[in-house]
Structures are given as C-alpha cells and as structure tokens.
C-alpha cells in the first residue's frame, strides 16, 4: 500500500468552489465550505455555554477569558472577528475548525484476475479522517472506475415447482454456455445454485399425506422452503450436474416462498461462498409471484423473520416452519448491507409485479428480465441484465440524518460539462472513470461524537471509509481546564470564563447567597407576569434582578426592571423612529417641541397650510398634521389641491367674467345696461393680450356674430379684485359663398343627369348589339325546306264529273 496522503484543510483559509482541474485530473481534494455571517450574540442566555455557542452556528466562537464582559456588556458568543475587536485574547477564543485528512489513497487498478494476489481497486480514496464542527460542511471528491475482469459471484436461485420442470432441464443444458458467456465479461467468474418451493404448511400445500409426499401430477419430491444445492465454484460441469440432479416438487397456491431463499442466500455467507471483493449476483428465476411478511400468519407462523442463516448440513432451511416470510424492507436492507445485485428472471405474466418490487428497492442494484416459458433465453437474459446493472453506478452510504450527519452528491458523470445533483451515473463501461463531489454536513449534535461512514457503489463491496469526529464540545470544558473553587466565582468553578456556582450560591459570579431560595425562585423575581419569560427573554436574571442583554448596535439599548423597554421599538414614519422628531422611550415617542402625533410626524404649526389669501386651507378645509383636509363644495363634491384651492364643479373665472366682457366691450350678451354697470371690474381693451404667466387665457364665441373673442384676467386673492384685458378685435369666420354653393349644386345635378343618360344609352346599345348578333347566328344556322311554297295557289282549277262513265264502245 503506498504511503498515505495527508491533506489538512482549515475553514477560514479555503474558498468554497472546487477548482476545475480537479475534475480533469481526478485528484482527491477536500474543501471546507466558507462560513456565513450569523447573529451569534442572540444565543439564549438560558443555555449560555461554550458548547451551546459553537453548536449554534458554524461562524460562532466563544471567548473564555475571565471578566471579559465585566467592563462592557459584550457577548461572549460572537464571531471571531467581533470577539477580537472587543478585546478577547486569541488564546481564549474557542472556534474549532473543520479539517479533512486523507489516510489511504491507493491508485485505481485493474489487477483483479484469478491468478493475481492483489485485488482490484475501483474507488479512490479508500479512507479519510474528518473533524467537523456543528452546522458546517466539508466537500471532497470520490472517483470510481470499473476494473477489467472484476470478480463476479453468480448464485442462481430457481423455483423448482412443477411448472418449472422444463426450465430446469433447459438450465442444465445451458450451464456451460452461461459460464462461457459470463467469462467474456470477466474471466474471474464463479457459479452457484439453490432452489426453493414454499413452506410445507397448509394452505400453501395440500394437507393430504399422499400429496405432501408427492404433490405433483407425476412422482416428485416433497416440498421444502429452500435448499442450497451448490456453493460458488468455477466448475461449470458440477453446476450442470447439480441442476440436473435437483428434484422438482410442488405447492398448492400460486405465490412461492422465494424471499426465504434470497434471505438465506445473503445471510449464509460462508456456506454460499461469497467473496468479499466481488460483485455478488443473485438470479431469481420463477414463473409465479411471491409470499412476503404476514402471509405466514395464514398457516399460524407469527414469528418474524430474523434475517440470519439457518441451513443444516444438507443445505435445507431449518426455520421455514417457524418464521414468517421476510418483509420487503428486510429484503431491501439485506441486499443493501451485503452489497448484492439481484436479477429477477420472471415470465411475461409476472413482469409488472416484479418491476414494482424492483422499484420498491431503492439504492440497490436490481433489474427485471422476461424469461421464456422454458428458460431458453436465460443466458442472454443474464448477460443483458448483468451489463445493465454493471453499467449503472449508484453511490450509497450509511449516513443517518437522525445522528446529525447528512451526505449529498453531485457529479458530471460521463458528459463532463454539467455538474448536477445526483448520486447515479449510467452508461459506465469497463475503464470509464466518473467522479462524485460529496458534501458532508453536520446538522446537530447528539451524545455520540465519533462515527464511521461508508460511501461506495451499490452492489459492490468497495467503500470509502470516512472516520468522522463531530466537534460539539469546547476544549475549555475539559475537566483539566476547569478552574475549581475560583475566587472570581466566590468559590464556584470557572468554566470557559463563566462561573458555575455550587453550595447554594447563585448569580453571575455566584455572589448571591439566598438561603432557602433556589435559582428557579430567583428567576421568578425576574418575570413581569407568571406567563412572561425571564427578563422578557432579553436579559439574564442575576440575584433576582434583570441584567439586560447588549445590542450589536451600541445606540440601541434595552432597559426597564424586566428589560421590557427599549429605544428602538417605537412607531416609525418614513422608516424613521419617531420621524427623527422625538425620542423613543419604552415603545412610545416623546416628541420634540413643535411636533406631535404617534410617531412625532405632525408639526403643531399651521404655516404649511396657509394659502395666498392668508386663509388656512383657502377657507375651504382644516389643517391636520401640517396638511389640508378639504371640505365638500356646495354641490357635494370635495375641494382639492394642496390648499383646497380647486373646486372641480364650480364655475371658473372665465365663465364668471364672460357676460361682463361681452356687454362692456361689444354691448352683446344677455346682460342689460344696468346689469353691465354692476360688473365688479372694467375691461381694458388692448390690441394684443399681454404674455403674463400668472394670467389665465379665456376664449368664447359671441352668439351675436359667431365671432371668437379673447381676454385675460388676473385675480388677486388678497384684495379680491380682478383685472381683465380684452382683445379689441374678434376672430370672425369668413362669409358663406351662397351663390357659389347654389350654382355648384345645380351644376352637379345637371352633370349627374347627363351621366345617367349616357349610361342608359350605353346599356341600350350593348343590348341591341347582343340581340342582333343572336339573330345573325340563328339565320346562318337555319335549314329551309325545298318543297313548294305552302301559300302559293295555281291559276287554274280542274273539276271532274262524278257521273261520267267514259267513251261508249
């Protein structure tokens, strides 16, 4: 074995990510994940010890210096940087570091041939030592490479009920071919054989004596639970002979007792002959279903299966009548613990059942193959399913979350591009190398401190052994570091800078001697009510009096007899405590002069509400908290604007001054002369309106001449006077051309009539031409009769005498 490689990694010195070169070279690396910031000072004072501190968070450290928190109320539990900043000597800081040390790291090798003394190495490294503190993580790489000619032990478990008679014969004939085919996969191959029927109990078998002796239609052997027929060997001729010699039997119900056989094949390691460093294969061949835990109760068997070996000298399972069938959970655990691989070779009608069984066995290597009715395809099936199992690697471990240890995996598998969360890689051929990034995390502490983790591929007895020590305790808590009968603790013991009182004394420095009063009784004096926490959970009870915890921000202080008050939990305005216009005192704001309100957000002065006319909120509202709250207008709508100067439905000054402008400048509009004289202003006629920003432009149409007139006004709210400028000239529309419109209409009508006549003429011409063309076509196609004219009459008429008899002889 080459010398061990040692790699020590401290959490404060190493980065988070693994370098890319690690994936390319396959070198083993270890990384401690960087610490994150955490408010360690919030550790509960009810359990304020060094070990509780380092277990609180990975970034928490403890200052064990005596009297460290005497002058200033600094927290002993804080980050290392904060403790040093507050003056804690480095030698007194308890901050255990996570480290990783690789103790065995042999190279991957293919030396697994039969004649080789050395065993193949498929996983790297082989052993490491990790010290990990609570709530921290450490990462390392595990490399796997499938070796050439890795040893394979194949144990064939066959259902020898009567329906499998032809299958037994075919297996006997194919024994040599099976061994020959498997040796093309690996030269280091051994073969074993066992058989099973069912429990020899009713209702699983026929209770009649003659049927118990020979349950088959033709003579056959008595039923049995399981029989080990042949141990693992390279002698294939013996395998063929043992299969041929094995006797067929039978049972009554359809399911078989195959689970008993699997458990015994796994439990009887020496009898079967399993090698420690070999791929253990069990081929489970049947044409029926299976019995499992609970079925034995039908026959009165209630004792659970213990999962241990019970074979006699002849290889028979001796507890078949005493123990129930194994549960699927027991089957899964034994396959996982023994690092075995199972191939279920079943007939087509049972494929779905055994596929469900295979899926119920997580993190173990199992597969299902369809067996021909006479098992003629058994060789191809085993070869195919073996390759399927061997080409898939599942990384498994024995980490127990309840013990505070958690392992997670990431890998690029064979694509080498994307690192993904998985513990499974597929398509692994002989010589292929895959790497897994493993993260070990401690989530909490238990009484146990030392653990042995085993990480390795499912179905292989090769593992990485990780010896783990969880750093849940501080060195200053060791017995040889405790200062007993310390003067600083008034005779108590000083542990990590904190006094541990004895002899009835209590208090921070054991200075309280209250005969007849327990610490619990003193703690009751530090509660505001019976239901309250001690010092409201924000301080410690010292001799029956509360000492409030310090805050990380020195400007924030907790106070009060029971630490019920502070200066940072008051109402805020714009995210500012008391709007920065007062002081926070025990949850209430004490406002500075000139300010009021729950959060001192309201000025007492109403200056901010004064409008230009000197009225508060323009006389249309009230000033509340420095802002105008407007009243409703006479029509029920609310005034608006910063000073309530806007009335959405009130008439504007433009509309109000319109009639006065019309009557004064042009003597038009609805006002008579008397009403016009009563207008509150006199217009100022100008050629062009002045360009003043503070004036409001107005324009209206005079109904008398349909001309638009313009004027500007300025209203002085202070004096309630208006100044109005009006432009002398109106903008009148041009006169309507009546004659042109009439002539245009007449011309349009005439032209339209002419166009209609022309259109009518065009249509008639086209129609006549069509009729004439039709007539010519009919004339040319006509065929006239050549007889006489039917209306022609000749000029002469001949009459014959009807009584004329002719000439006499």
From Swiss-Prot:
Post-translational changes noted in the entry: Phosphorylated. Dephosphorylated by dep-1.
Listed transmembrane segments: 738-758
Phenotype caused by lack of the gene: RNAi-mediated knockdown in distal tip cell (DTC) causes DTC migration and guidance defects during the second phase of gonad elongation resulting in a triangular shaped gonad. Embryos at the comma and 1.5-fold stages have increased number of cell corpses. RNAi-mediated knockdown causes an accumulation in the proximal gonad of endomitotic mature oocytes. RNAi-mediated knockdown results in increased mobility of let-23 receptor on the plasma membrane of vulval cells resulting in enhanced activity of the signaling pathway.
InterPro entries cross-referenced by the UniProt entry: EGF_extracell (IPR013111), Integrin_beta_N (IPR033760), Integrin_bsu (IPR015812), Integrin_bsu_cyt_dom (IPR014836), Integrin_bsu_tail (IPR012896), Integrin_bsu_tail_dom_sf (IPR036349), Integrin_bsu_VWA (IPR002369), Integrin_dom_sf (IPR032695)
A biological process term (GO) from this entry: striated muscle cell development
UniProt KW keywords: Cell adhesion, Cell junction, Cell membrane, Cytoplasm, Disulfide bond, EGF-like domain, Glycoprotein, Integrin, Membrane, Phosphoprotein, Receptor, Repeat, Signal, Transmembrane, Transmembrane helix
Record topological domains on the Cytoplasmic side: 759-809
Protein name: Integrin beta pat-3
Lineage: Eukaryota, Metazoa, Ecdysozoa, Nematoda, Chromadorea
Gene: pat-3
């Amino acid at each position: 074995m080459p010398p061990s490689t040692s790699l020590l990694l401290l959490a404060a010195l190493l980065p988070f990510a693994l370098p890319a070169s690690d994936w390319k070279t396959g070198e083993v690396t270890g990384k401690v994940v960087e610490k994150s910031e955490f408010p360690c000072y919030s550790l509960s004072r009810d359990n304020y010890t060094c070990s509780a501190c380092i277990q609180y968070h990975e970034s928490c450290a403890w200052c064990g210096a005596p009297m460290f928190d005497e002058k200033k109320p600094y927290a002993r539990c804080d980050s290392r940087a904060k403790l040093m900043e507050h003056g804690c000597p480095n030698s007194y800081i308890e901050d255990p570091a996570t480290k990783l040390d690789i103790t065995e790291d042999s190279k991957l090798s293919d030396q697994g041939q039969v004649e080789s003394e050395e065993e193949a190495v498929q996983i790297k490294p082989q052993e490491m030592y990790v010290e990990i503190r609570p709530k921290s993580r450490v990462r390392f790489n595990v490399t796997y490479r499938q070796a050439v000619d890795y040893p394979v032990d194949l144990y064939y478990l066959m259902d020898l009920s009567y329906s499998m008679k032809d299958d037994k014969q075919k297996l006997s004939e194919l024994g040599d071919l099976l061994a020959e085919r498997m040796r093309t996969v690996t030269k280091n191959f051994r073969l074993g054989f066992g058989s099973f029927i069912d429990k020899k109990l009713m209702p699983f078998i026929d209770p009649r004596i003659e049927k118990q002796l020979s349950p088959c239609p033709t003579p056959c052997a008595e039923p049995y639970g399981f029989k080990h027929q042949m141990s693992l060997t390279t002698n294939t001729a013996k395998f063929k002979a043992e299969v041929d010699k094995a006797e067929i039997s039978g049972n009554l119900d359809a399911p078989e007792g195959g689970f008993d056989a699997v458990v015994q094949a796994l439990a009887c390691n020496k009898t079967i002959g399993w090698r420690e460093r070999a791929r253990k294969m069990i081929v489970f061949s049947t044409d029926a279903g299976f019995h499992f835990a609970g079925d034995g109760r039908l026959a009165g068997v209630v004792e659970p299966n213990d999962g241990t070996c019970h074979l006699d000298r002849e290889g028979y399972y001796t507890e078949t009548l005493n123990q129930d069938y194994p549960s699927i959970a027991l089957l899964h655990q034994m396959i996982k613990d023994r690092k075995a691989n199972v191939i279920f070779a079943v007939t087509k009608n049972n494929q779905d059942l055994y596929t469900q069984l295979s899926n119920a066995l997580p993190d173990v290597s199992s597969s299902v193959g369809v067996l021909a009715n006479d098992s003629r395809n058994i060789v191809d099936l085993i070869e195919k399913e073996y390759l399927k199992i061997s080409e898939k690697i599942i990384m498994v471990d024995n980490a127990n979350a309840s013990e505070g240890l958690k392992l997670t995996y990431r890998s690029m598998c064979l694509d080498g591009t994307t690192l993904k969360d998985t513990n499974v890689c597929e398509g692994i051929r002989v010589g292929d190398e895959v790497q897994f990034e493993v993260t070990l995390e401690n989530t909490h502490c238990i009484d146990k401190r030392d653990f042995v983790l085993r990480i390795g591929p499912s179905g292989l007895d090769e593992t990485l052994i990780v010896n783990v020590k969880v750093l849940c305790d501080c060195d200053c808590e060791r017995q040889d570091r405790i200062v007993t009968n310390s003067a600083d603790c008034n005779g108590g013991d000083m542990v990590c800078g904190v006094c541990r009182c004895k002899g009835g004394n209590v208090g921070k420095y054991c200075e309280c001697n209250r005969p007849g009063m327990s610490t619990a009784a003193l703690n009751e004096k530090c509660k505001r009510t019976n239901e309250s926490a001690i010092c409201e959970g924000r301080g410690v009870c010292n001799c029956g009096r509360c000492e409030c915890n310090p805050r990380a921000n020195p400007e924030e202080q907790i106070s009060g007899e029971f630490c019920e008050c502070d200066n940072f939990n008051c109402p805020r305005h714009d995210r500012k405590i008391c709007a920065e216009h007062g002081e926070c005192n025990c949850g209430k704001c004490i406002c500075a002069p000139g300010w009021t309100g729950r959060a001192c957000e309201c000025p007492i002065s109403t200056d901010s509400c004064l409008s230009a006319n000197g009225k508060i909120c323009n006389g249309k509202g009230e000033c509340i908290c420095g802002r105008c709250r407007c009243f409703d207008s006479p029509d029920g709508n609310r005034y608006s604007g910063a000073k309530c100067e806007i009335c959405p439905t009130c008439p504007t000054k433009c509309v109000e001054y319109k009639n006065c402008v019309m009557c004064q400048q042009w003597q038009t509009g609805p006002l008579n002369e008397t009403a016009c004289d009563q207008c509150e202003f006199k217009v100022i006629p100008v050629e062009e309106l002045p360009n003043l920003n503070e004036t409001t432009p107005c324009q209206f149409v005079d109904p008398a001449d349909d001309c638009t007139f313009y004027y500007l006004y300025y209203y002085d709210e202070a004096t309630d006077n208006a100044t109005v400028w009006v432009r002398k000239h109106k903008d009148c529309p041009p006169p309507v051309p009546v004659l042109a419109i009439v002539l245009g209409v007449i011309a349009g009508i005439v032209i339209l009539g002419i166009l209609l006549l022309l259109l009518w003429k065009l249509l008639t011409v086209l129609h006549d031409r069509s009729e004439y063309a039709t007539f010519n076509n009919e004339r040319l196609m006509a065929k006239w009769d050549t007889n006489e004219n039917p209306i022609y009459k000749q000029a002469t008429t001949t009459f014959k005498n009807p009584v004329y008899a002719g000439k006499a002889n």
